[in-house]
């Protein structure tokens, strides 16, 4: 019985390790399936079970230029980048991409500085907005696409002003582009 309990506890961990051996893009592809024609997103478990179906957002958190893509090694650390970096200009407003509730606001994540925000969108989907110069939301606050949650900055482990935009499914980083339509080009 003890061996069965250990196997049940370790099964999700082993699934994550197996998928992660294919890299962060492999994990992202396993959890999020996108229909490029309809912009419909299927969010799944590592075992392939459907969690929910969504429509991709057109509300990028900031207009700007992508300076680093998801999964690309991040110098000087040489680990895969867990989000997308967007440079829209220091002090520009940062908005939430999808309806949700603020889970964390402040310094809760190593390297993000004092003005990070994490939003719980339900279905195990969270988004993180890091390196901001200020945040203006409180834990438990409801937010919707377009609501300003902070300002672009260079807080924490940042080489310059930008927004680090990360989406996680059940705690695993996935490619934010899977949830977005188009590009965050400056208007």
Label each residue range with its predicted role.
Residues 79-81, 96-136, 161-163:
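Zn2+-dependent peptidoglycan hydrolase active-site motif and core
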Residues 2-71, 187:
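Polar/charged, compositionally biased leader and regulatory segments
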Residues 86, 115-119, 144-156:
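Short hydrophobic beta/alpha edge segments that flank linear recognition/processing sites
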Residues 65-96, 169:
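Short glycine/threonine/proline-enriched tight-turn/helix- or strand-capping micro-motif at secondary-structure
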Residues 87, 134-147, 166-187:
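Acidic, glycine-rich catalytic/binding loops that coordinate metals and/or anionic ligands
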Residues 91-92, 107-110, 154-157, 168:
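Short polar/acidic secondary-structure junctions
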Residues 64, 82-84, 115-117, 147, ...:
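Extracytoplasmic/periplasmic beta-strand context in beta-sandwich domains
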Residues 93-104, 137-152:
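Short, well-structured beta-strand-loop connectors
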């Amino acid at each position: 019985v003890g061996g069965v309990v250990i196997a049940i506890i370790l099964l999700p961990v082993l699934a994550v390790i197996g998928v992660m051996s294919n890299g962060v893009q492999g994990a992202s592809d396993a959890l999020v399936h996108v229909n490029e024609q309809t912009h419909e997103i299927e969010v799944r478990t590592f075992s392939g079970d459907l969690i929910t179906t969504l429509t991709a957002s057109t509300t990028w958190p900031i207009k700007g230029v992508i300076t680093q893509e998801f999964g690309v090694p991040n110098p000087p650390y040489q680990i895969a980048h867990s989000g997308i970096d967007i440079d829209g200009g220091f002090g520009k407003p940062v908005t939430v991409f999808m309806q949700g509730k603020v889970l964390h606001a402040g310094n809760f994540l190593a390297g993000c500085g004092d003005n990070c925000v994490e939003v719980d969108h339900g279905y195990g989907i969270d988004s993180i907005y890091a390196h901001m110069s200020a945040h203006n939301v409180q834990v438990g606050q409801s937010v919707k696409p377009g609501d300003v949650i902070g300002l672009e900055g260079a807080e924490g482990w940042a080489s310059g002003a930008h927004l680090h935009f990360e989406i996680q499914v059940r705690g695993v980083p996935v490619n934010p582009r899977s949830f977005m339509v188009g590009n965050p080009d400056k208007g």
